[in-house]
Curated annotation (Swiss-Prot):
Subcellular location: Nucleus
Annotated function: Probable transcription factor.
GO molecular function terms attached to this record: DNA-binding transcription factor activity, RNA polymerase II-specific; sequence-specific DNA binding
Protein name according to UniProt: Homeobox-leucine zipper protein HOX18
InterPro entries from the UniProt entry: HD (IPR001356), HD-ZIP_Homeobox_LZ_Class_II (IPR050762), Homeobox_CS (IPR017970), Homeodomain-like_sf (IPR009057), Leu_zip_homeo (IPR003106)
Region of interest (Leucine-zipper), ranges: 170-214
Alphabetical list of Pfam families matching this protein: HALZ, Homeodomain
Tissue: Expressed in roots, leaf sheaths and blades and panicles.
Amino acid sequence: MEGEDLGSWLGLGIGGGGYAYGGDDCRRSPSSPSPVQMLFSQHVKEEITRGYDHGRDEEQASGSKIMKGERGARLRVMRSIRNSGGDGSRSRVLSLGDDGGDGGSGSGGGGGTRKKLQLTKEQSTLLEDSFRVHNILSHAQKHELARQLKLKPRQVEVWFQNRRARTKLKQTEVDCEFLKRCCESLTEENKQLKHELMELRRLASAAAAAAGSQLYVQFPRAAAAAMVNVCPSCEKVTVMGGGGGETGKSSSSYSS
C-alpha cells in the first residue's frame, strides 16, 4: 500500500514563515506565521519594536548633541582668538613674574602664557629691603608686608620665592666660575710639576751614566806626591815616591 501525503511537515525557523509540501518541491507560504512568532502575543511584539525604535532615536540624539558641542567649542575658540587680537594676550593669567623685584616689563616672558606683575619703584624698594632683612617671611610678616604694599599675600610669597631662586642661581654661577678658575690653575700647576719631574729624571739618568763610566776615583796630586813611613826597627823616616820605591832616606834618627 503506497503512503499517502497528509500535508504534515516539521521545520525550524525564525521569522521565515512556514513551508508547505506540494508534490516534490517545497515552496514558501508567506501567509503562514513562523513558529517563533506564534510564541509571542501581538502586545509583546509591539513593545519590542517600540524599544528598538526608542534606542535608535536616543543614539541619533546623542550623536547630534556631540556634534553640536564640538561645533560650539570651535566657535568659542575662534571667537576668543578674534577678540584677543590673534595672540591670546587677553586670556593670559595675571601672575607674579620672575623679575617682579625690578618692576616688571608687563609682557609675558614664559612663551606668552603669563603676564608679569607691575610693581612701582617704592614697592620694589620695600620688597628688596624686606628681603635683605628676612629672606623667609612668617605668616604675620607676609600679611603685614602685603598690607603695606597693597598686594595679595600670595603675590608677596611668590615674589620672595622667585627672589630666593634668583639669589641661589647667582651664587651657583659665582661658585661655578670660582671652581673653573681653580681647575685651570691646578691644571697649569700639574703641567709644570710634570715638566720638572721629567727634567729631574733626565738629570738623574745622566749622572748615573757618568758614574758608571768611572770605576775608580783619582786622588789629588798633593796627596799622591809623597808618602812618609816610619821604619819600626831602625826608627828612620823613609819617604816613598808615588811609584812605591825609596826616593831617599833621612839620616836622622829618633832616640827614645
